[in-house]
């Protein structure tokens, strides 16, 4: 982030009025309670507790704190003209309605816009297992081409004669070099990666592997190289030892130059015939050793997410049975695989290729390699330090993209298998070595259990059939929890709520079935910026007496412009103020290739070698890095309607103020802090500002028009802040140690 120095971001501290008197409390009262995990009443020092004070509602639907203190603040605000932003920094009198979920801001990852295969997944070879079907251009050959006319290239299905590498990936390449090339004795096939060729870095190490055999004994060596179409070679190796049996060959290649586009991986043989499968090229420099592109992982880590919802989305629903995402397929159904004298379980080589509901391009067909499967997703959550929130199919296909969507009867064995898959996922994550799926996890290399608190059942379903299905999942989990409470007792199911901001089907179902073990209702909506600005108080009136809370599983303001991002920022002030009822919220979609976009808007854009965050990304980052445990009492007066939006939180004693100015004019805001003494904080606050002159400004590879800028601000009980036009400002007062 750049340090901000421009005149319009300058904020000065000043006394407002010598006659203003503010009520303060000792530092220990606020800091002592923060993040304590108690009932929210607070017991810092000798101050008041919630039991001492009558709770009253304010304009944000929150319970009131100390009435006398609030009255004093109101009088003080009345003495000041203009926009007044008043914050009570004392949390000792707050009740549970001010408690903010510790998983409020997170991520949702769906393989749309080529987000995973060809994107986040670090694999560089397209159609590495030769399993692309007839939907692809050139059928199974898609992604591959011969290096010269001297090569005959075909794909064989080895399932019939038992020649396949394994049962889950039956197809493999048969390459015959006729030996008629006058240019070189070695010819074969080459792969150009996903889009515009591969990107390589000089001196970087890349792990290259492939499976190979020769049925007629005519080939004993394979030459692999990184090259371009004009013949330039950046790295080359010859690997010997090919026999009549499948073997896995592994090596490392290091390019002698950097090329951002149009690099190919060539796999060549002398005159003769050889068979190939699972040809892979992956950079060694990945995110924390996982098969994740390093820049993708770092961009997500910078958001400081508390959870990750995966893998969809419509991906888990499918347009038909063939395109439904299967978590068991994503780990190769736990299949054991022996090669080169070693046995693996769930290896990528035994993961069947799946179709995607987002497959819609003949030029760039969309398949699911499952290279990033559930095992890797859970590991990725551990690396990010966030909670995994997997989503599973509910026994029916997508209601939106399937006019005649498929629904299994709850008596069908096929439906019962979907229920069993959900139970088995719990066993995979939490079971020990005595359980079937727990043993699979351990054999894959993860001895300790994975965290698992929530499972989403379905995505954007709302019909009666879905609720009938959901009821069967609930019944099965109740029975499982009764039989084995240690394994299943803590897992909670998430119920879908349709596709729009006015959808209420999930809530209506729970109202009719209050005994259901549901704690989260999954709301999804994509709206205009104007809608978000007009509905910042959406959750003020939600019923606090219900067990179920809100999971805002997908939302966005339909554009990647500054004004849309600020509308989301304004809306997020309402999420913070209602953090007692909104348990989790995540923007969607997460990633998009710059040239393969299937949905607008998106949070992060990428190419083969670069990545950038949209303006919306930086809004999420500023909130994710400035979340709190308590929503503080605030009042805002004197602001023109739908101009200034605000929230304030306590984060382990730090006080964090957020101001969103959606007008195209600078706004002078008088900030008044009551409650804790200012000696509780450092004299200067950290300030982060996201702003721009043009509300339609958007970021791109060529122009990062809007990014956060950081600075310092001297603060006092009363100070003035000039909120720039079109801006989000975060002011963080750092608490001193007691």
Regions found by a protein language model. Name each.
Residues 107, 210, 304, 381, ...:
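Conserved, mostly hydrophobic/aromatic
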Residues 22-47:
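Sec-dependent signal peptide cleavage junction
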Residues 238, 642-678, 687, 729-732:
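Carbohydrate-binding surface patches
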Residues 10-28:
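Sec-dependent N-terminal signal peptides of Gram-positive bacterial secreted proteins and lipoproteins
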Residues 73-369, 387, 402-416, 467, ...:
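Extracellular and organelle-lumenal recognition/adhesion modules and their flexible linkers in secreted
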Residues 231, 236-239, 248-250, 276, ...:
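Active-site cleft segment of glycoside hydrolase catalytic domains centered on the general acid/base Glu
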Residues 253-257, 261-264, 284-305, 362, ...:
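An active-site-proximal structural segment forming one wall of the substrate-binding cleft
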Residues 475-480, 501, 509-626, 662-664, ...:
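Catalytic-core region of carbohydrate-active enzymes that cleave or remodel glycosidic bonds
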